[in-house]
Amino acid sequence: MASYYETTDFLGAPPASFREGLLGYGNPAVPALAGNHLVAAWSTDGRDAASVQDWGVFTSAGGLGAGVVRRTAGPLRVTGYHLSLSGGTGDAAVGVGYQGFSGDATALGRYNRLTVGTVARPSPYLSIGLAGNVALETDDREVVGEVGVRPLGDGRWTLFADAAWGEGEALTGVPWSAGTSVEVVDGVDLRTRVFDSEAVSIGIRVEFGRAGIDSQSRLDPTGDYAGQVNRVRAGDYEPSVLAETVREGKEHVELSLRGPVPYRDTRFGDLFGDAPPRFYELLRTVRQAGESDRVTALAVDLSDLEVRPELAWELRTAVQRAQARGVTVVAHLENGGMTAYHLASVADVVALDPQGSLTLPGYAASRTFVKGTLDKLGLGVQAWRFFEYKSAFERFSRTDYSRADSLQRRQYVDDQYELTTGDITAARPLGADSLDRIIDERLLLTAREARQAGLVDTLARWHEREGLLEAAAGAETADLGTDALDQIATAIRDWGAPAEVAVVYGLGATQVEGGMGSRKLSKTIRHLAEDDDVAAVVFRVDSPGGSPVAAAQVAEAIKACAAEKPVIVSQGQVAGSGGYWVSTHADTIVAGPNTVTGSIGVIGGWIYDEGFGDKTGLSSDVVQRGERADLLRGLRLPLLGVSIPTRKLTDEELGRVETIIQKGYDEFVAAVAAGRDTTEAHIRDVGAGRIYSGLDGTEVGLVDEIGGLPRAIQLARRATGLAADELTVREVNPTSGTVDFGQFLPGPLGVLADGLGEGGEARPGTQAHPTGTALRLILEHQPGPLVLLPPGAVPTAE
């Protein structure tokens, strides 16, 4: 069987120690670590540079490797091919492969063989490779070992050595090689390799980003020139000072925010078209654009944008950071409301479609009360409210706001208005009084009126963006796709897997199975606590609360995780009631200025049949043993799976429920006080169900800092004590469920079936129905207590 060195002479260094390593031809584990590439290699004989003695083509994608090699020895020709499969993590991989030969194979010692291999990179300083070759037609066996050392912990300087032991060979006669590689600048390195035979190879590699060239000259043991091996690579981006220098300041990035901005993808979400970019992906792209020397401008299409105000503020803040690094921003609108214009106003150039308009009415908190509807349906309501501001049941028991609820909503609306108008007037050439007059007197502005008022800079359509970018940036630029930008930003060839900041999402109502899914989520968080690869956790919460059981499960998991490593909570649009409970044990709570937070309180209520059966023709019967066994039985609504009890609670039963709710509140207060390291008396003072904006939350000690998800990640990085290049961010649960069946149910049934999904989004492109969420939770949990925000307290997406 031809030896390892005979079959891998295209390699400039051992396969697991240097770059793409022939993509599985030398060690089948390499493709799992190398990425996606296509390599063409050929060798020359002697000084005839135009001659081609041997050639090969190698490729890898998704851990799969394949290649074809043609070799010539005088009149003999042999063609070899290989297939390999590998998998692993950033610091270890295993692989298996098959090599077959045709032509004059046996004459040149080529026999079909099975190959197995592994690569371990336990640290940035060390790489170890081991491969075994087993001939399938003879008894030949071979073991290849290699080691690579990077004294500086990165690719600037690499030392390497390898050896191949064939079965029956004496260890003292094992062939070996050793050498070194020095990366002069990113993408340019010099390499030398010495063999036990005293032959030497000297090589140079030059990368141009997505392509590169490599050439090595071979000297025989006497020092005479023996030929040359050349390679050309195309594929994943490799760090390259040449590419960055050539493209510096000559590219722009385009972002389309049309439609919803979800936190997570749904499974098969892009089956019938492109899935919208996720919130974190948008934040990442804007950050990477700001950090890239290539990118000089950012174009953002906000037409048909559907995003909640808090998430828009976070995106706006990210854009501001990119601008601070010198990126020019152009924002485009076809039509816009308060939220979309708030986001657009930060841009250096705001363009509005010539036939478009702006609708700027200000902000209002409204609620539709359904007590009259329930009365007409024959559904009776018993509301149990023991805390002044805990108003979640008012929608079902009143026809207007209570004084306390009106007060807290007024304060929140004022904060939202002041933040938005303050940001707009700071970014645009108009004063606060002028903007107030536009909002109070104009409401709807045509495109030309918006331009005259100074709200937009120009009238143009999205297809004219290149001209807008050129005018704004002062030069023509090429479009750098978001995927390409991400590859460039993450193209780090260090060995080993960096420590992780894990971003985990807690979205939707606090429910054990639906919504946030506390059972599964708690398990995930506890696993992160035990995972040594995770250095810190960022818990993104967007939840109006719900079941106290579910909230407590997640809160205890966060507490356990925080005992092992830093945990930072990032509160999104809403983290109230049970959504606040799950946040309490984090080391730091970061909220946006308009996050709905707080609402520390417990509510309960009872909805029962008071003529509903007579009106609908439904009836029920019950056989019971136990004085109150009938309490939880009644009319079960078809399709929805919820029951309507047939009677209201007695005074004795109401007394028992009040005791349970008060005890539940005591436990809630105690949990928050312990998590926030404060007194229960203070939490009772700021509790009683009152909601706060993030800004007000900092004043009463419920929030530590104003910021978004990027700020939470930054704090998590800082808490680890590790350098930025020693950490990577990983989203733990970026995919949600598949289908929301509530969309197929008509009218009131759809309202009942609809659940609050990702941070208030039932499914991409639609709004969850808060009344349906609350009503369903009440019916499923009554007469038990709930830690739930009042429906409608969460601002809707525009």
Regions inferred by a protein language model and the residue ranges of each:
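N-terminal, post-signal peptide beta-strand-biased segments of exported outer-membrane/organellar beta-barrel
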Residues: 1-63
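Outer-membrane beta-barrel porins/channels
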Residues: 5-8, 45-46, 54-238
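Short, positively biased Gly/Pro-containing turn/loop motifs at secondary-structure boundaries
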Residues: 720-730
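Substrate-recognition/specificity elements adjacent to catalytic centers across diverse enzyme folds
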Residues: 570
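Small-residue-centered hinge/linker elements
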Residues: 226-431, 435-440, 444, 460, ...
